[in-house]
């Protein structure tokens, strides 16, 4: 069976981030889902410091090698964000790109105690549509009530 990937919107993700970076003079990025580091290579490699989370050990090790000046955490970003991890840097650019819904990650960041810059740019990829298209809505917490009432297959109609 082929490996599951969600890079159908990569060029749009990259374009959004490149444009959004222009909104901040000295960006300090927090990337909540580092993945394989492809967006970093295209958008953030010129930045000396930042924060990235990745829960898979093989990926987090690669991210640490890729960005030696960054704080790289092998952790579930929701729990880490709630605990204030990454608060040692004045993050002013938040990049949220989960495979699924972004809402729990955004809640964790904004509910945490951390320094708040005068200006914060937030870029978000919401994978919910892709989850619904592939009949995976049952995985998404925010869809649970609807899945219980309507079933999984009827959540996305083309």
Regions found by a protein language model. Give the residues of each.
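Acidic/glycine-enriched edge-of-secondary-structure segments
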Residues: 2, 64, 69, 148-154
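A generic structural motif
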Residues: 53, 74, 123-127
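Short, conserved active-site loop motifs that form the nucleotide-linked donor/cofactor pocket
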Residues: 69-71, 120
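Cofactor-binding loops of NAD(P)H-dependent oxidoreductases
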Residues: 73-75, 96
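Class I S-adenosyl-L-methionine
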Residues: 81-93, 98-158
